[in-house]
């Protein structure tokens, strides 16, 4: 299975440019603002909110680094690692939830939060809800399952809209493996019911990516 991508533009933070003193000063400013936040005017509250959100995002960067490292190193067959990965997911989701100082958040924040959430859901689903069928496919040495990689590498990083659309069209064709081989493998090895759940789960998980795909061929 392919790696689950995380948006590099958020991860590539030049930490060396920020001294320890400045970090402490920033955190101190935020804590001081929390203590006096109730006395701010409407305009001041908006500015304070933006500052708090920005600093919270800064603090979330380290958790995002940890998340990215664990995604790359995650051994999909070890439940102990899955348990730790879930803790990282929960921690990161809580962290970015705090950055939303008001009812709205920036597009980048919302996109990143949604992507992290869906990546976590995908891993948890495969190793909890789909674990029995996954074990059977692994024992069978299914080539289709072993090669299955629904999300094109780098699609979230590509800035050329034409290239993105081309990648999406290719994804529609092989989202469930070459010639939709995952359907055949899951139905034969597990059950029709297992396939129905699997299909629904992964179409929902990547709804932004495959929203224009025609999966009527899957029945």
From Swiss-Prot:
- Sequence ranges on the Cytoplasmic membrane side: 1-20
Q: Which Pfam families match?
A: DUF19
Q: Where in the cell is it found?
A: Membrane
Q: Which residues are glycosylated?
A: 104, 204
Supply the alphabetized keyword list. Glycoprotein, Membrane, Signal-anchor, Transmembrane, Transmembrane helix
The record, for InterPro entries, names: T20D4.11-like_dom, UPF0376
Segments crossing the lipid bilayer: 21-43
**Residue numbers on the Extracellular membrane side:** 44-219
* Cellular component terms (Gene Ontology): membrane
Membrane-topology annotation of the record: Single-pass type II membrane protein
Q: Does the keyword Glycoprotein apply?
A: yes
Which family does the UniProt entry place this protein in? Belongs to the UPF0376 family.
Protein name, per record? UPF0376 protein C36C5.12
Query: To which species is this protein native?
Result: Caenorhabditis elegans
């Amino acid at each position: 299975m392919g790696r689950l991508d995380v948006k590099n533009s958020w991860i590539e933070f030049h930490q060396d440019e920020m001294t320890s003193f400045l970090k402490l000063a920033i955190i101190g400013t935020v804590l001081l603002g929390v203590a006096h936040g109730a006395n701010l005017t409407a305009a001041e509250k908006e500015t304070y909110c933006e500052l708090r959100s920005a600093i919270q995002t800064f603090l979330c960067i380290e958790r995002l680094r940890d998340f990215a490292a664990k995604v790359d190193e995650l051994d999909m067959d070890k439940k102990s690692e899955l348990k730790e990965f879930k803790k990282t997911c929960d921690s990161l989701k809580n962290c970015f939830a705090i950055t939303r100082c008001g009812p709205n958040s920036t597009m980048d924040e919302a996109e990143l939060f949604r992507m992290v959430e869906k990546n976590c859901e995908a891993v948890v689903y495969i190793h909890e809800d789909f674990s029995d069928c996954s074990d059977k496919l692994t024992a069978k040495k299914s080539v289709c399952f072993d090669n299955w990689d629904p999300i094109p590498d780098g699609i979230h990083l590509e800035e050329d809209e034409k290239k993105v659309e081309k990648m999406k069209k290719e994804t529609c064709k092989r989202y469930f493996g070459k010639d939709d081989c995952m359907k055949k493998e899951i139905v034969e090895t597990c059950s029709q019911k297992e396939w129905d759940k699997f299909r629904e789960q992964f179409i929902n998980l990547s709804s932004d990516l495959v929203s224009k795909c025609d999966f009527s061929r899957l029945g």
